[in-house]
C-alpha cells in the first residue's frame, strides 16, 4: 500500500518486521517465526490433507504467516480462525486478515473441535507436549494437523508424555524444514498427523 515511512523492497512486511523485532529483543515465548517457503509448504500440505468443508484453525498464529500462505493456496479467509496469546500479534493478525476470525487465547483455552489445524507451536518440550495433548483433546478420529515441530520431537523417548501423546496420532507425512529460522539455530520438521 506504500504507507511505510521508508523504502521497503520485500513482499512480506509483517514477517520481516517480526524478524527485526527478534533481532533487537531476542526470541520471546518460543516464537520461532515461520519462514515464507516453509509456510507455503505447510499450506500446500494443508490443502492436500485437510477436509475442505471444515474451518482451518491457525493455532499460535502470530501475525498470520501461515494464514497468508493458506490464502495464497486458495483457502478463503472466512474459512480460517487464528488464535494466539500475544495481544499485539493478534491485533496485527486481525488487521491483516479482517475476513478471518481472530482470538486472543492460549491453546489450552480453546475447547471446541478443531478438525483442521495448522501450527508452529511453542518449541519448549513441556509446551510442545501440552500443545499436542490439547490437539488430541480437540480433535476427533480422522481430523488432521500440519505442524512445524522441533526436529525429531515426535520420536523422543523422554519425557514419556511425548510418546504417550503421540499414540493418539497417525503420522501421515514428515519432512525436514528446508530453510533456517531467522535469528535462531533450531532445526525443525513439518509433520502431518491424523487423530487416531
PLM feature spans:
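Class I S-adenosyl-L-methionine-dependent methyltransferase catalytic core
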Residues: 1-196
